[in-house]
Amino acid sequence: MNKTIKYFTLFLVCFFLLKIGKAQLVDKTPAAVPVAPSIYNREPYEDPTISGINRDASRVTAYSYATINDALTSNREKSGRYISLNGEWDFAFALKPGDEPKDFYKSKVSGWKKIPIPSNWEMQGYDKPIYKSAVYPFRPVNPPYVPKDYNGVGCYQKSFTVPADWKDKNITLHFGGVSSAYKLWINGKFAGYAEDSFLPSEFNITPYLQDGENII
């Protein structure tokens, strides 16, 4: 589940990538759940000191395989440790922050439109494309604050099931690129935040997963 605040266009690719190893533990308990950004005096995308919350450090692209033969195919889809979440997602759009569905991440939604992932929502009939290479696409400019009267927000949701043989493994959620900032919830729990439209971002979501259906 993620909520995206954007200025320009959205491009989102997401898939699971398993890292070899046990789930992160602290004193034999799951790694601490980060504090939701609602405690901040302002949103994280208006704080220049924050570029991510609970976001893994950037790294080279790599995938985990169960056997050498699988790895030699150089095809991530041949790995039993990979699930693609590309495809249709439930989607709701609002023209400005505050108008999006409230607390939608707490339960499974119904009646929402469908949107393909990856895609730009502007190319799917929502809002209009904006491209500016040198100046801000809005006025007035008052850093670090962003416009509140017009600044499109997209809410996405998708259900998925984790294979039983992934138990006790670290599970990483990878976003290929999201413009320009987004928050992530797994099963109703805040799991992270990231910026950087054209860079991938990853989160260890192991502590938030449950048996059976999961909701992002």
Describe these PLM feature segments.
Residues 1-27:
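Bacterial Sec-dependent N-terminal signal peptides
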Residues 20, 86, 109-110, 157, ...:
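A generic alpha-helix preference that emphasizes hydrophobic side chains
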